């Protein structure tokens, strides 16, 4: 084989390889691209298909592919457009390190025929790496004795980039002691040194902190920093120094052994042992100094050693040396002058005589309290004594003679502020140092009755339920007296007054010692709503002092009164009402009304009405208003209905538990057009006593109407005469409403005080009738000025607002806190946010909401004496000359009398309180179109009849 290799075949093989290489170079080419490092995914590199001379359509059929030994995933070719792009992150420092050249070699292979192309992609460096020092803090220790221009080598920073991006420059923070020396090479920093500029002084600056910054040459440039902490080592170059070169001190001749004379202090700014100091007496030392004094070598304290004698030696001069512990010790010196002082060894003596204690707190200033004498056995200045007294006390010392003083009261005393004073008298001589003596005296202050008992507040409010047991405790009053002993002993008593017809002491009593207030008898809310009285507190001093406190006892209502029925006439039996009604009435016609009152208040007086059925399941053509008591028809009546109906109405309050009363209503049906007398006689045989009762009611109604008409005519005549007369003080005049007030006894008082009034658009002004609770203060009169008529003319245009000076009574305030839900009184008024619950109102016969209202409602927890009449904002109440208000209030009763006649088409939810079934008659009269004046007189007569029934 060797021979064959060396023979003819060898040239042929060599020629074959040369041909293959030539064909390879002919069929293959090499492309060069460049791309920056850290390029984003999809960054364009080159049109590789176009540069290789390949058609885009033949890339896929010829299986165009890219291969790389280690970095095949960094670059990729899009076979759709033949573009070479960046596929993943390229980090030049990771690929090539610090090599100057960095390339990615790819092999592009296509088949049919097989071709291989070499592609070289050069990765360009970017400035993405900052300079980095080996450590963030570098500590350097330099002795303060190092001379200037001394160099201290430093470690430079490194930058992973290449070229300009890795060319580093350094800078050092400006300072007076160091500078930076940097020598650059072509590739990297070769040497970096810290050069000392001037001599260091550790005593001035112990440590230097400098910041060394390295910046590369990239754009933008990146920086790196290292903190240089330079510690200066100490050198013993400072000697100890005393604060003074000469010290002067004094010492008493009787000083004990070990008494501190002075503590010398020398300082050495050096560090360590170079700053440790040793104290000693500087040689040569006199024997007298060694005998009398000693020095502590560590802290420099000089103390007495032997007995000093002023008469033997008055002054010592001592030289003291301070030496440090450095390798070459350095020393400092000072001179100490010790002066021995004469001793003041006798203290003053203080004597206090003629004490007048204790003293009364009303003692006048300048009064003498005690005599004080002082003495001192020393002579000269050591025997001169001065006295002083405790500061900030109402006493003073007055010198009367040499070494004699008087203790005098300087200002007024107040035992309640300070009850005793501890006084200290200090006597001090004139020695150096001086001696002193003290004497204490306790001055007590005797009490004087100068403070009256004081209550915590001037008025208390107490709430007590009615029907309380006799003798129950309702409240406790307490007064404090700042005095002492008997002057502070407080006793309590009632301030007697009359409550109505009875004495206050019949209602309540107060315990003289404890101040407990007791109710002596059961309280009745209906009789007494508010009991206001005063309790007096007096001390036992001479003379006694006292003060009063006001108690307002509100009696809270309990449901202890059942509803009471109001009968329509004197001839009716209690709880029984008889009414006649025609058969032709339609549904909703009001045929009768049950009236009841409750003496309680609040919910306890809120009444509801229920119709009791005679048999279970029985159906009758009547219903009763839940809160009005009006009995109305539920359907039109026919012939099959019984001619007589006996209805039982249950009246119930809302107390806990509820109390009830039962009313019996006898209804008799008559034919239309049949006279009541004829019907009564016709049914006399069948009904018997009931028919007789109907006859009596008819005659009674006729009589009441006649009397009422006469009363109305009398009132009209009286009003006309009063208004036509010249106005005098307190007389009735146009524009001046008359205010009617009710007292607890039911009497009426009149005044000309201005109150809110209701004015109409035409006709004379209407007189207001206002009833106030007995708990309110009495009505006060006020004179009217000349501007009254101008105000009245303005009043004709629009309603006046309610007087803000008026206040509700206690019962009214309590009742108005209760939420009243009435079924038929129209209490829900739509608002922006939905129905708004308000107080139900009692309105006049008009169906419009602008009619007059009485607020709050009947039986809604409000005392009837506190109601006032008002008109709605829309249409003021129209009234003719001489007319009375449509409604007025009976004092002491929640019933409201209606003078206007109810129209025929009124529904059962109207809130008129009293009707006697005369609506059918009114309807017939309207059809006949009788005169308005005759109609109004009859309507007023009916209302007057209602009033007389109540």
UniProtKB/Swiss-Prot annotation:
Described purpose of this protein according to its UniProt entry: Potential calcium-dependent cell-adhesion protein. May be involved in the establishment and maintenance of specific neuronal connections in the brain.
Organism, scientific name: Homo sapiens (Human)
Residue ranges of PXXP repeats: 734-737, 774-777, 799-802, 832-835, 873-876, 891-894
Signal peptide stretch: 1-29
Region called 6 X 4 AA repeats of P-X-X-P, residue ranges: 734-894
Annotated spans, Disordered: 780-806, 829-950
Any Gene Ontology CC annotation: plasma membrane
Biological classification of the source: Eukaryota, Metazoa, Chordata, Craniata, Vertebrata
Chief location: membrane
InterPro entries: Cadherin-like_dom, Cadherin-like_sf, Cadherin_CBD, Cadherin_CS, Cadherin_N, Protocadherin/Cadherin-CA
Protein name: Protocadherin alpha-13
């Amino acid at each position: 084989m060797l021979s064959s290799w060396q023979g003819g075949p060898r040239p042929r093989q060599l020629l074959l390889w040369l041909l293959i290489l030539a064909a390879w170079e002919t069929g293959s080419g090499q492309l060069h691209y460049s791309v920056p490092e850290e390029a984003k995914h999809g960054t364009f590199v080159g049109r590789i298909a176009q540069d290789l001379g390949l058609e885009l359509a033949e890339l896929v059929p010829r299986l165009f592919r890219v291969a790389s030994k280690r970095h095949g995933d960094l670059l990729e070719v899009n076979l759709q457009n033949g573009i070479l792009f960046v596929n993943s992150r390229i980090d030049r420092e990771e690929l090539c390190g610090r090599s100057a050249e960095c390339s990615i070699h790819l092999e592009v292979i296509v088949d049919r025929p097989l071709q291989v192309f070499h592609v070289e992609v050069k990765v360009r460096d970017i400035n993405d790496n900052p300079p980095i020092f080996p450590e963030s803090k570098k500590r350097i220790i330099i002795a303060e004795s190092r001379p200037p221009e001394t160099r201290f080598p430093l470690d430079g920073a490194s930058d992973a980039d290449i070229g300009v991006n890795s060319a580093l420059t350094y800078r050092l923070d400006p300072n007076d002691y160091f500078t930076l020396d940097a020598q650059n090479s072509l590739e990297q920093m070769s040497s970096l040194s810290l050069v000392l500029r001037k001599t260091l002084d550790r005593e001035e600056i112990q440590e230097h902190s400098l910041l060394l910054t390295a910046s590369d040459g990239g754009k933008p440039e990146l920086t790196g920093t290292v903190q240089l902490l330079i510690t200066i080592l100490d050198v013993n170059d400072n000697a100890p120094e005393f604060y003074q070169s000469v010290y002067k001190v004094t010492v008493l001749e009787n000083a004990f052994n070990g008494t501190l004379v002075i503590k010398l202090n020398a300082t050495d700014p050096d560090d360590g042992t170079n700053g440790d100091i040793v104290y000693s007496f500087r040689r040569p030392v006199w024997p007298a100094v060694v005998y009398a004094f000693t020095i502590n070598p560590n802290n420099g304290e000089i103390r007495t050693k032997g007995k000093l004698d002023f008469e033997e030696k008055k002054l010592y001069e001592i030289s003291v040396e301070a030496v440090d512990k450095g390798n070459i010790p350095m020393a400092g010196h000072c001179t100490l002058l010790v002066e021995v002082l004469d001793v003041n060894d006798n203290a003053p003596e203080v004597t206090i005589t003629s004490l007048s204690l204790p003293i009364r707190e009303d003692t006048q200033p300048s009064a003498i309290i005690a005599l004080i004498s002082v003495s001192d056995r020393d002579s000269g200045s050591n025997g001169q004594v001065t006295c002083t007294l405790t500061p900030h006390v109402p006493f003073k010392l007055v010198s009367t003679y040499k070494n004699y003083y008087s203790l005098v009261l300087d200002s007024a005393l107040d035992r309640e502020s300070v009850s005793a004073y501890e006084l200290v008298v200090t006597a001090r001589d004139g020695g150096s140092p001086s001696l002193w003596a003290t004497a204490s005296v306790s001055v007590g202050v005797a009490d004087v009755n100068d403070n009256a008992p004081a209550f915590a507040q001037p008025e208390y409010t107490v709430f007590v339920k009615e029907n309380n047991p006799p003798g129950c405790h309702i409240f406790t009053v307490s007064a404090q007296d700042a005095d002492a002993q008997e002057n502070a002993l407080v006793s309590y008593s009632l301030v007697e007054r009359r409550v109505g017809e009875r004495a206050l002491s019949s209602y309540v009593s107060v315990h003289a010692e404890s101040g407990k207030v007791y109710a002596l008898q059961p309280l009745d809310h209906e009789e007494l709503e508010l009991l206001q009285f005063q309790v007096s507190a007096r001390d036992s001093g001479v003379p006694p002092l006292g003060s009063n406190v006001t108690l307002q006892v509100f009696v809270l209502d309990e449901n202890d009164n059942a509803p009471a029925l109001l009968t329509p006439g004197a001839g009716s039996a209690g709880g029984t009402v008889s009414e006649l009604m025609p058969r032709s009435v339609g549904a909703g016609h009001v045929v009768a009304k049950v009236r009841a009152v409750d003496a309680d208040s609040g919910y306890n007086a809120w009444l509801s009405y229920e119709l009791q059925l005679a048999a279970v399941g029985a159906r009758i053509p009547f219903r009763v208003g839940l809160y009005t008591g009006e009995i109305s028809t539920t359907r039109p009546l026919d012939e099959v209905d019984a001619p007589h109906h006996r209805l039982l109405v249950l009246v119930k309050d809302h107390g806990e538990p509820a109390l009830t009363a039962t009313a019996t209503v006898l209804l008799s049906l008559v034919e239309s057009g049949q006279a009541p007398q004829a019907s009564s006689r016709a049914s006399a045989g069948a009904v018997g006593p009931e028919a007789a009762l109907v006859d009596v009611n008819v005659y009674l109604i006729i009589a009441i109407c006649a009397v009422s008409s006469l009363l109305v005519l009398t009132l009209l005549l009286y009003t006309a005469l009063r208004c036509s007369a010249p106005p005098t003080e307190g007389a009735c005049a146009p524009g001046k409403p008359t205010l009617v007030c009710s007292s607890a006894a039911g009497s009426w008082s009149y005044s000309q005080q201005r109150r809110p009034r209701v004015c109409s658009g035409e006709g004379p002004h209407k007189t207001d009738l206002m009833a106030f609770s007995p708990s309110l203060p009495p009505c006060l009169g006020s004179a009217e000025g000349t501007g009254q008529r101008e105000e009245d003319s303005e009043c004709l245009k629009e309603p006046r607002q309610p007087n803000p000076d008026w206040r509700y009574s206690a019962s009214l305030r309590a009742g108005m806190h209760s939420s009243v839900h009435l079924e038929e009184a129209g209490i829900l008024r739509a608002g922006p946010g939905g129905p708004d619950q308000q107080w139900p109102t009692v309105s006049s016969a008009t169906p419009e909401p602008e009619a007059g209202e009485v607020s709050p409602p009947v039986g809604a927890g409000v005392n009837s004496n506190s109601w006032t009449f008002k008109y709605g904002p829309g249409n003021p109440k129209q009234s003719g000359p001489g007319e009375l208000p449509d409604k007025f209030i009976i004092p002491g009763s929640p019933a409201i009398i209606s003078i206007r006649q109810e129209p025929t088409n009124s529904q059962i939810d109207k809130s008129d309180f009293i009707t006697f079934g005369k609506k059918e008659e009114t309807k017939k009269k309207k059809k006949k179109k009788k005169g308005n004046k005759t109609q109004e007189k009859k309507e007023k007569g009916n209302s007057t009849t209602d009033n007389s029934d109540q």
